[in-house]
């Protein structure tokens, strides 16, 4: 199937066109414009537990007012929680600065939205899909991939790639005037200094003033937590416990949650009271151009900290290393819209089976301001951390003796000798300078 047959560059008049409808200015104007130009628009809205959305049920009603043939609200929260837990289990986070990660909350949301909305469209025999993503961003490719994975007969029509739409409604002012001219009392909201996209797992703030690196996190008004950098905002230390069973978070502060959606919402409330999980990242988009974002993810951060504490106390060094390497690779695949590709499923299955299954236990933390926290206690029946093995005190039945360590160190002579030989080779070839004043002066001793 060639791109020319898949991507429609002009409006398919007389045909059903599904649109991912948010109720905002862009999708409202696009839906009405498509209707007036002769298409049959069908509106689909994903309920992702967006923290900045007050009334989900009002969105489909608004779509019908703008001329949709039908409008549906698709509850995606349970699937989003499932994918969020999978990302935690795999450590699927490749973007970080100074050890603080971006939890790929937007890519996770796109994986769920792209598959579930297109599945709903198939039920209505709608095989043309449009959304609000622009040609410069990541989402246009993510939705393209997930849409075609779900429905191989899908065709893509995006008003923002249609030159006629751009010529007639090229900006927010033109779209607002278009709605008013057609009898809709649309009052354009005051534009923020940045744009925000959110779901139950996290929020993304980017563009506009945030494109400039001298505009920092302080211009952002958090929607999932507090502005912890503001000294006038009171943030009190708080102890919280997180319990996992076979890699799945199941309880907060001793209270079990059968519904993972409710679990995430409570984790967001707890972490949000402190601004936990906020970060400022420069990242590489799919097309290899750099962008900048301010991110919130209080619940994901809380689960990630507790999960990794248990991972390090349960698994050996080689397993932890592989978990981290695979997590970086999987995070990038997730970011690229390949969360359901075979190479991603292989990495996911490895972590979920061999890492997560052993992660049972409870971690207690003290949360303070932002990403400032302390781990107070770690408990697990599977801990391989046994302090008596390395105790500096005299213990009965020691795991090993001084003579055992002498033998172990003696065996190291083999690779130390090999390393000295190689360093000599590097010196002779000019790669290393050995002897007096060099980094390794002792190697210049011919004796």
From Swiss-Prot:
PROSITE patterns listed in its UniProt record: ARGININOSUCCIN_SYN_1 (PS00564), ARGININOSUCCIN_SYN_2 (PS00565)
InterPro entries assigned: Arg_succ_synth_type2_subfam (IPR023437), Arginosuc_syn_C (IPR048268), Arginosuc_syn_N (IPR048267), Arginosuc_synth (IPR001518), Arginosuc_synth_CS (IPR018223), Arginosuc_synth_type_1_subfam (IPR023434), AS_cat/multimer_dom_body (IPR024074), AS_multimer_C_tail (IPR024073)
Binding site for ATP: 20-28, 46, 132, 134, 139, 197
SUPFAM superfamilies per UniProt: Adenine nucleotide alpha hydrolases-like, Argininosuccinate synthetase, C-terminal domain
Gene3D superfamilies: 1.10.287.400, Argininosuccinate synthetase, chain A, domain 2, HUPs
Pfam families assigned to the protein according to its UniProt record, in alphabetical order: Arginosuc_syn_C (PF20979), Arginosuc_synth (PF00764)
Binding annotation for L-citrulline: 102, 138, 142, 195, 204, 206, 283
Highest taxon in the source lineage: Bacteria
Gene Ontology biological process terms from the UniProt entry: argininosuccinate metabolic process; L-arginine biosynthetic process; urea cycle
Catalytic activity: L-citrulline + L-aspartate + ATP = 2-(N(omega)-L-arginino)succinate + AMP + diphosphate + H(+)
Enzyme class: ligase
Pathway where it operates: Amino-acid biosynthesis; L-arginine biosynthesis; L-arginine from L-ornithine and carbamoyl phosphate: step 2/3
Similarity remark: Belongs to the argininosuccinate synthase family. Type 2 subfamily.
Protein's name in the database: Argininosuccinate synthase
Organism: Neisseria meningitidis serogroup B (strain ATCC BAA-335 / MC58)
GN (gene name): argG
